[in-house]
Amino acid sequence: VFSSAATENLESGAVNLEVAKGDRIKVRDCLYGLMLKSANEVANGLAEHVSGSVPSFAKKMNRRAQELGCTNTNFVNPSGLNNAKHLSTPHDMALIAKACFDRADFRAIDRTVSYHFPATQKRPNGTDIVMGHRMISSGNADYYPGILGGKTGYTSAAGNTLVTCAERN
């Protein structure tokens, strides 16, 4: 069940799927909403579901990042939205991405081009979401053969970000 903290504490202009307090959405659907749409309230809701709160989840993220060998990463929230203490490096993000891409369940979600996100209070018919990573879709001019997946991002502080994994030969 989504809380008001998960759904209402987003910075202006943050990408979301209009999930509201009290909405019930399966974890699997949330993962698609997170990876395809970058829905920030969904990231917060998943964090609360897993750890009870966003700060507790951020602590788990930081522990896992250290286990993966990250040395210049500090997470403050699960969405990546602006926070002066939230930081990482390309090298550390590559380590995290590798761990993600090693999982078949992650790759299956991350390679999905479109998905029907289920009904919510504000969208009773659900909504179709489309992967924002243009290199994944073979019908896009930016398509990259051999791509396994990736994640786009944007914040006003960081600008456009991208981590991608591909295999060739």
Annotate each predicted stretch with a short phrase.
Residues 8-43, 126-149:
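Conserved catalytic neighborhood of penicillin-recognizing serine enzymes
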Residues 2-6, 21-23, 31, 48-50, ...:
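A mature extracytoplasmic/lumenal domain signature
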Residues 52-169:
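Penicillin-recognizing serine hydrolase domain
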Residues 1-16, 111-118:
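Short, glycine/proline-biased beta-turn/loop segments that scaffold the active-site neighborhood
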Residues 42-43, 47, 65:
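Small-residue (primarily alanine) positions within well-ordered alpha-helices
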